[in-house]
């Protein structure tokens, strides 16, 4: 069964079409209308070995908040839908990724219980025109709509761009491991019998 999903979300603030294929690393196409965020989602697709297609626009003349948050909603919904019954998945994933002077660790559990721990601080308030505070909003929206428990911890780092890259790469690698299917797992990896 193909583990892929498409989400279309249109509000007065944003217009988003997002697709993910968890089992394909074919070329992705990402156009969020926020160049820095395109770069982060491209890193996510590449390091997770996911095919991700995004076309979106929003009220970025105000700021990027609505669009970044809604992209988190859509990615969370898409991952949740693509996982389906979650039969055979590893469930847990963890990854540490260095990026020059910084190191970030991401741990996650596809538990059906959305929760975010986000311990990341930035020295700069803007990267080009992008507000680093929106990264937390993205991941909060993602966890709320995917049912995933997600812990993001920056061990150290000073360059805001490097920190965000490290976060997205670690997130991608942890999610890749968690969604991987292991033939030894019968049903779902839970004593409750469901996730």
Please provide the spans of the model-predicted regions.
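Structural preference for solvent-exposed beta-strand-turn elements
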Residues: 1-195
């Amino acid at each position: 069964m193909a583990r892929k999903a498409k989400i279309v979300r249109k509000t007065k603030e944003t217009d988003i079409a997002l697709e993910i294929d968890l089992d394909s690393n074919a070329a992705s196409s990402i156009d969020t209308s926020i160049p820095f965020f395109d770069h982060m989602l491209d890193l996510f697709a590449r390091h997770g070995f996911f095919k991700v297609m995004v076309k979106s626009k929003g009220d970025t003349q105000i700021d990027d908040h609505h669009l970044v948050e809604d992209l988190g909603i859509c990615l969370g919904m898409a991952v949740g839908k693509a996982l389906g019954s979650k039969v055979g998945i590893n469930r847990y994933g963890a990854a540490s990724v260095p990026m020059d002077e910084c190191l970030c660790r991401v741990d996650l559990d596809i538990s059906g219980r959305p929760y975010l721990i986000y311990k990341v601080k930035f020295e700069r308030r803007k990267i080009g025109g992008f507000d680093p505070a929106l990264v937390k909003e993205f991941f909060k929206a993602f966890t709320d709509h995917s049912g995933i428990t997600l812990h993001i911890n920056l061990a150290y780092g000073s360059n805001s761009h490097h920190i965000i890259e490290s976060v997205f790469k670690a997130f991608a690698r942890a999610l890749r491991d968690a969604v991987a299917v292991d033939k030894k797992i019968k049903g779902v990896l839970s004593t409750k019998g469901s996730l």
